[in-house]
């Protein structure tokens, strides 16, 4: 998170709204920059997450997903058997998704935090309060943007249909509910940014106390952001894998994609994954995902810290101009 921006104007909640909007814009910009930088790792991780073992003989059907040995093998084979552009399949939907997700998350997180600080007349919130606010912001984010991520997951596996085509296909064959597959694990994954941001703020506060400085340098922000994301990623990765499995499956039995093992819901998916792959099956694709999320989160914090100050300043300037024009009228 950026250094706290002090608000000196006396326009009440409007100031909180403007500040929240500045954080939302900077978060969206930073999120898109980060995912554009690390997207191939996300594609590889998704391929590994949805990959399943072949069923034993005698069972009804055999899963035909091409098995990758590990992240490096997946990188090599995707480039060799398909082409390097495949690593960027679904990038457009991912940019839309991360832009919208970051905007919604940062807007509500900043707004709720600012209002809470004002009501409690405090400079900093406690860990529980921070977690609660982060969770509320995360739920708003999931409910708003989950359909985009369902489409993105499908495109990373099969990019033939495109964004609009994939939306239409899901609605036609699976109904509107198909766009919300994986909702329960996605809501559980709200704890990921909650753990991430609380860890970051606690690490930042500790760093500032130890160094005796109030402003962190770019490298320090990058390192703390990476550590915070690593902590959150390890804790919540199994839920991410379950979410990817649920989102990747098609409700159309005639579709080749549906030849993968079908899950009735979250608990059914957890049980079947554990039965077929064991405990380690919940961590498939984790190395490439950790590279993507840790570097991406660190880069996002770095970019957001640089952008947010200017974004909030511009918004306050525009607000003052608007107020002056209204007074003239």
UniProtKB/Swiss-Prot annotation:
Keyword hit for Transmembrane helix: yes
Gene Ontology terms: cellular component: peroxisomal membrane; peroxisome
Compartments (UniProt record): Peroxisome membrane
Bilayer topology annotation: Multi-pass membrane protein
Principal location: membrane
Coiled coil: none
Keywords: Membrane, Peroxisome, Repeat, Transmembrane, Transmembrane helix, Transport
Membrane-crossing residue ranges in chain numbering: 21-41, 95-115, 131-151, 175-195, 221-241, 298-318
GO molecular function terms listed in the Swiss-Prot or TrEMBL record: ADP transmembrane transporter activity; AMP transmembrane transporter activity; ATP transmembrane transporter activity; coenzyme A transmembrane transporter activity; FAD transmembrane transporter activity; FMN transmembrane transporter activity; NAD transmembrane transporter activity
Keyword Electron transport listed: no
Conditions for induction: Down-regulated by phagocytic stimuli.
Similarity-based family: Belongs to the mitochondrial carrier (TC 2.A.29) family.
Function: May have transport activity.
Protein name: Mitochondrial substrate carrier family protein Q
Species this chain originates from: Dictyostelium discoideum (Social amoeba)
Lineage: Eukaryota, Amoebozoa, Evosea, Eumycetozoa, Dictyostelia
Gene name per UniProt: mcfQ
């Amino acid at each position: 998170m950026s250094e706290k921006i002090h608000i000196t104007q006396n326009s009440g909640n409007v100031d909180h709204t403007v500040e929240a909007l500045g954080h939302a814009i900077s978060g969206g910009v930073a999120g898109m920059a980060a995912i554009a930088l690390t997207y191939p790792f996300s594609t590889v991780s998704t391929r590994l997450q949805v990959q399943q073992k072949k069923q034993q003989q005698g069972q009804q059907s055999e899963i035909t997903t091409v098995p990758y040995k590990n992240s490096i093998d997946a990188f090599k084979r995707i480039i060799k058997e398909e082409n390097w552009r495949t690593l960027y399949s679904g990038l457009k939907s991912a940019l839309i998704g991360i832009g919208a997700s970051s905007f919604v998350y940062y807007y509500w997180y900043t707004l709720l935090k600012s209002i809470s600080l004002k009501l409690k007349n405090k400079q900093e919130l406690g860990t529980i309060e921070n977690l609660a606010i982060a969770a509320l912001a995360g739920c708003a984010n999931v409910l708003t943007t989950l359909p985009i991520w369902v489409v993105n997951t499908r495109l990373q596996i099969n990019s033939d249909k495109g964004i609009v085509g994939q939306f239409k296909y899901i609605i036609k064959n699976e109904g509107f509910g198909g766009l919300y597959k994986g909702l329960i694990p996605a809501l559980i994954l709200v704890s990921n940014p909650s753990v991430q941001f609380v860890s970051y703020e606690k690490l930042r506060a500790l760093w500032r106390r130890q160094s005796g400085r109030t402003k962190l340098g770019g490298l320090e922000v990058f390192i703390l952001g990476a550590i915070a994301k690593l902590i959150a990623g390890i804790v919540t990765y199994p839920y991410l894998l379950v979410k990817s499995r649920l989102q990747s499956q098609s409700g159309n039995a005639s579709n080749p994609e549906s030849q993968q093992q079908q899950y009735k819901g979250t608990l059914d998916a957890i049980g079947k994954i554990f039965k077929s792959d064991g405990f380690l099956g919940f961590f498939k694709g984790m190395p490439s995902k950790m590279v993507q999320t840790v570097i991406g989160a660190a880069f996002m914090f770095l970019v957001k810290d640089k952008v947010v100050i200017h974004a909030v300043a511009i918004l306050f300037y525009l607000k003052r101009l608007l107020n002056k024009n209204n007074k003239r009228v």
